[in-house]
Amino acid sequence: MIFLLVFHTLVFSYWVFHIQSLVDAALGMRNVGERDSASGIDWVIQGVRGLSLMRLRRPLMALFSMALLCSVGFSAASVQARSLVLAIQGEPETGFDPIMGWGRYGHPLFQSTLLRFDPQMNLQGDLATSWVLSDDRLVWRITLRDDAVFSDGTPLTAEDVVFTFNTARDADGLADVKALKQARVVNDHTVELVLNKPRITFLNELVSLGIVPKATYGQGYARHPVGSGPFQMVEWREGAQLVVKPNPYWYGQSIPFERVTFVFGGEQTGLTLARTGQAQMVAVPPAQADQPPEGMHLLSVKSVDNRGIAFPVVPAEGQTTVSGAPIGNRVTADRAIRVAVNQGLDRDALVQLALNGHGRPALGPVDGLPWNNPQAHQVSYDPDAARKTLNAAGWVDQDGDGIRERDGVKARFKLYYAAADSTRQALALGAAQQLALIGIQVEPVGASWNEIKHYMHQSPVVMGWGALSAGEMRNLYSGATAGQGYFNTGFYQNAEVDQHMAQAEAAASYEDSLAQWQAAQWDGHTGFGVKGDAPWAWMVNLQHTYWVSDCLETGPLQIHPHGHGFPITHDLPSWRWTCEP
Amino acid sequence: MNSWWGRLMMKRLCRLVWLLPLTAVLLFTLVSLAPIDPVQAYVGARMSMIGPEQQAAIEAAWGLDQPGWIRFFHWLAHLVQGDLGDSISYNAPVLTVLVERFPASLALMGCSFLAAFVVGSGLGVLAAACQGRWPDRLIRGWAMVISVSPGFWIALLFISIFAVQLAWLPSCCALPPGVTQDEAHWWQYGRHLVLPVLTLSIYGTGPLILHVRQRLIGFLDGPSARHLRLHGMSSTRLALGPGSRHALGSAVTVHLASIGELFGGSVLAETIFAWPGLGQATVKAATGADAPLLLGIALVTVVVVLLGNLLADILAAWVDPRLRIMPQEETLPRLKRLPWLKASARLKTASRLKVEPKS
Amino acid sequence: MKRVMVSIVSIVTRSDDTGKSYRLALFMAIVVTLMIWGGGALPDTMMAVNPAQRSLAPSWQHWLGTDLLGRDMASRTLAGLAQSLKVGLLAAALSTLLAMVMGMMAALNRSLDRLVSSLTDMMLGMPHFVLLIMVAYAFGGGTVGVTWAVALTHWPRLARLLRHEAKTLVKSDYVQVSRSLGRSNLWLARHHLMPHLMPQWIAGFVVIFPHAILHEAGLSFIGLGIEPHLPSIGVMLANSLNAMLAGFWWVVLAPGLGLMLVAFGFERLGERLRRQALPPDRGSSGVSPGQVA
């Protein structure tokens, strides 16, 4: 068998050597366009003809070519000085068009945005030098810096900003700018964005929507982006890698890298590159993060990439959604059950079990973000408190089967999770074990999202969210989004919470809105936190794990949103190389 | 159109006329049956930031709010104009995606195709020449083993041996990181091709080895071989000369007919080796609910397989003139000719292709 | 009962080719039963995540080592094979059933015959794996998807063969007599065709079976097959990539080898049965895998 393997390799390497012209023609079709496609067929025919008698002379040739291949292969040092290779996955298959959704997470690389968050989540101007909201909270007046230039050399003006926002509003991509009524030019460096209704979370669009040039934006833009950001594209081989270099026209600080390469492909691609020393930063799955190779260290980044249990909070009374999905659950409709679950979950154990320790307990949906209200989610692992809560509410185990009941209703429910996700599976199984101790029987059910869609208004589901915008929180807890898509699956509704969130949206500034967002979680007598209605039991926040070269200094990192990988590029322009080149 | 290959082409074209539309309907039915919500697959993790209004707009932009049969006719109308629709997961016309990704796949599949043919038929000839002795047994065992081992598993073993343990060859991608196409040397392409091609070609050699061996043994036991041997031709020369010619003609046919399998193998190989070709796009389309792209890829592969079969027939007839449809048969009355011709042609082909019984 | 036992024993202990086939068949049947029964009955503790025992090399305690999450590879492989065998059995059964129905329909009704043969042609003209992906996609993936995908793509060759056989049968005198006596097509199929097609049908089943499990593994590998929370060879191999790059070769070796051995056993059995029950293929009798499946 080994003999055959070697034989196969030899003969094959001979072929590799000789069909180079075909490979060239095929892979470099753009450059070598003059080669006609007949060459492939020629090779087949010649191969057939040459087969019969020439075979014996070939092994020698093959041996020679094999040796040559290996020797040239080893002398190749592919990484040049001060060029950076990142294998953090997350290839944007749809291209680099902000209007279709590029740049929502991490840095848009090629484009710049009006505003940005610094690592501590404070708002800063990027293209904008001032941003003022009108008294009726409907018009943003934004002044632009005057030194912004696109990478093709043309200056960025108010026209481009207005064009970008209006086009994004009408586009059917992954940038939801539907809240915008109209963007208009005031003068060369001032624009006004008019909203449909007061909405402070529109700031999120100012932070994430990269500005495109009006003059050259068109069909092929997504694959050949031009922007005023820190980088410009050198080459994007789809499915393989993206190569960028600093944009000489960028208005920011100088970037210490001649070239930055993003290698795509699966997790295993990154692991290989890390082990062979070819990549300086690699996104690794938590299960394997603990043994970084020589010259690299583990970087574990905090995130709000959270997982929790969404409870149906209305009792089952036979109602269904338009699509016929049943609504309501008579067990989880009782607040006592939901609070007891919150108290009975050992979140530290779940972090160990499901995340290999690379995570932190989640108490609320926005742990660590400026609009979080820690008071609202004060809960710790305390089975005794959970039992007390249940006893007080009348849930007692009378028949001695280990499951509590009240009025003939057993304290049990199914817990759905996406079967394709092993982390969620571990969380569901772990939660079931822990809750059995306090007398609640949980039956974990792995299912596809299509099945979950049908049962999610009736049974608790393991869900994950985590965006860097309070808009997400509004979507999850607002009575207006009850039953809409995956947002508020439990039909949670609290008029006071809605009131606080509406006030937050109508705030005069980002800073002013924070207090109202916090009040929605707990305002002293109600809220959606555990102290209040507890429609969710949050379990864990993931930590995103990377292997980083010891020579690479990334500085302070922003807390990560949902999505492992690309968010780490948020401050890429300020990264430094600390070793000699 | 009087030549033999012209007639063959005509026959195949007629087949295409009913086969392609039927295939199109079947494929479209399959993708429309899928219970996967494409909007959800597209939006993915950003679900929380995409409001219901925007989701409805996306749905309308893709025409998903219309019933299936209307979508089918839309698609068909565009297809006739050479437009395969727009890929959802790549946000580009399907045709662009296919053209963009085809070269990488062609390089991979082309090399594997040739390598498999060379190695497969070579081993087949070797096995037949040493019939019954240890090389024959070894090769037959090898062919049996690889025909039942999962191709992707072989790929993993190769990576384990050559990329991880020995560290001779790269285990991923088409080029080293940080190198653009303009800067790349041909040997860099070559090095990165080795493992994927090795995997893909090994998978295709199994049936070929057995086929060539069988044919060659049939020839060597036949009267013509006996005749040549009596005239003093050595067994080796017999096997390599006229024997090989006898066996390889049909080997080409068998091998070309396996193009479909090759594409299937490339889907798995490209996934493992992070090869930026059509196979990778297929997986992305299937897991990302990208129905237009999936349809496009399926249609293109159907056409490629049909072309492969056509090429197989032409090559087979070119190598072996007896397989050509002879012009004199053309003179028979048209109505009666067709069924008769088919039957007789089949009979003749059968008797000629038949392995002579071992004496 | 005693006579049945005696005849079974006498067949199994025969020293000729038939006896060998039966012995192999009996052996494979025992293997399958043991695996499905054993794989399903494995204690959960063997498969539980155990951070203290991550990536251990094969030892006396763990014959085939442990994976990245500390699960015993031997148990996982066994459970994965059981899962694969279940899906394979179901899919192959559905597939051969479909082939049988198609073949008989074609033989008994001329217009259905045209439909069946053009359907067969179409299915054979399409690249196999692409079709598998499309059908799996149509059913939304998962265990259900992969079962249907394999079932709906493996019937054409067997159907073509059974159609041919059934057509010969229909032409025979006794069928013609029955037909002229006014027997319905259903009756003819049940009493005349089915019994005669049984051997081919069984041989077809055994030949299709290894293909079914190999293709199931392939689909699961790319994420369109069995859900990752169930043990299955394809999923295990897909997850083993990372471990293998870290040098843990045993994680890859065991599942693949297990799958290969099972497939190999059935391939040999199918080859034997095919030689006995199915007419020899013209030209290329040595090429086993693609012929019927």
Predicted regions and their residues:
Chain B
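Short hydrophobic, aromatic-rich alpha-helical segments embedded in or entering the lipid bilayer
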Residues: 49-81, 273-285
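Hydrophobic alpha-helical membrane-insertion segments
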Residues: 20-29, 145-162, 254-260
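Alpha-helical transmembrane segments of integral membrane proteins
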Residues: 2-7, 20, 98-135, 151, ...
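Membrane-interfacial helix-loop-helix junctions in multi-pass membrane proteins
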Residues: 59-68, 85-90, 94, 176-193, ...
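Hydrophobic alpha-helical transmembrane segments of membrane transport/permease proteins
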Residues: 20-70, 166-186
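N-terminal signal-anchor/signal peptide hydrophobic helix marking the start
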Residues: 10-16
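Membrane-water interface segments at transmembrane-helix boundaries in multipass membrane proteins
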Residues: 141-206
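Individual transmembrane alpha-helix segments
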Residues: 67-111
